[in-house]
């Protein structure tokens, strides 16, 4: 027989022993009560108690009554359990412990403690599972609250960017207010978590705005607060452009102002300034026929045949090519009459108009009114000096 059969036999033996002991105790109690009634009277029998030795003797008698006889032991052999569920080994100590009136007030089965212990263990195992489920539920509720709070904050930011919507006076709100429900403990915790989430700044939305504000503050200039005042003074390039346009007009129109023809001792005719010229000012154009060098040589040979004809030919180079201005023919232009001097107050300069070179005279220094206008012819050849000795000076 297995362990299950042995346990069942032990339980059955204990139950039978308990019943026999109860019967023996009841019989002894009746006999003792009758004896005391005879010895001490009825009052003592009614309120008397059984002594401890008597109870122990009764239990021992009950166990002895349930113990198998020698014939049964010899037939089964030592340690062999009965077929009717009883067992004779190591069962007496447990029976005594459970039947002792000092240790427990009532009778109970020996397996009750083991059952109760396993029951308590099952309860203890269930407590952590409940706590884990509760924590998971709280985390899920907290995450939902944070997400809802972030969505509401983003919606507020979008509405603020779009601008407030002004309702019409006759328009009624279509959405009705939802019914108010009493707040629960879970809602209160979710509300607290949502408030904490709202206190934290939203990095994805507010960071670019702060950066943009910093950029606009850095880009602030003085002109954002005060109007721009343009200077009335002209730049150097503007002045040069205006002077060039004025010279073009004077050359094309042929105007010659601020000078006159006068007779100079030892020289003949000369040009005198009638106004003051500053350094760099345009004075007059050396006007004549613009010809190339080949034509100039032919004319010069022709002019040499008549000694009364003066020399009014001026050679120069322009764009790597030699040209000549022939002012020999008599005209009313004053530039051809300005005399020579190595230390003159004017100098020649090329001025082109639409790609055509013009020879002009500008003031090399400040010229006062009444002063003769002079410039260096630049001819230092021996033949020229022999023909015109005044070129030395």
From Swiss-Prot:
Per the record, residues carrying Phosphoserine are 100
Q: What is the effect of changing residue 375 to A?
A: Strongly reduces affinity for histone H4 and methyltransferase activity
Q: Where is the composition biased (Basic and acidic residues)?
A: 72-85, 150-162
Q: What's the impact of mutating residue 311 to A?
A: Strongly reduces affinity for histone H4
Task: Relate the outcome reported for changing residue 162 to R.
Answer: Increases the interaction with SIRT2. Reduces the number of mitotic foci formation. Does not affect methyltransferase activity
Describe what happens upon changing residue 388 to F. Increases affinity for histone H4
> What the protein does?
Protein-lysine N-methyltransferase that monomethylates both histones and non-histone proteins. Specifically monomethylates 'Lys-20' of histone H4 (H4K20me1). H4K20me1 is enriched during mitosis and represents a specific tag for epigenetic transcriptional repression. Mainly functions in euchromatin regions, thereby playing a central role in the silencing of euchromatic genes. Required for cell proliferation, probably by contributing to the maintenance of proper higher-order structure of DNA during mitosis. Involved in chromosome condensation and proper cytokinesis.
Q: What is this protein called?
A: N-lysine methyltransferase KMT5A
Q: Which organism is it from?
A: Homo sapiens (Human)
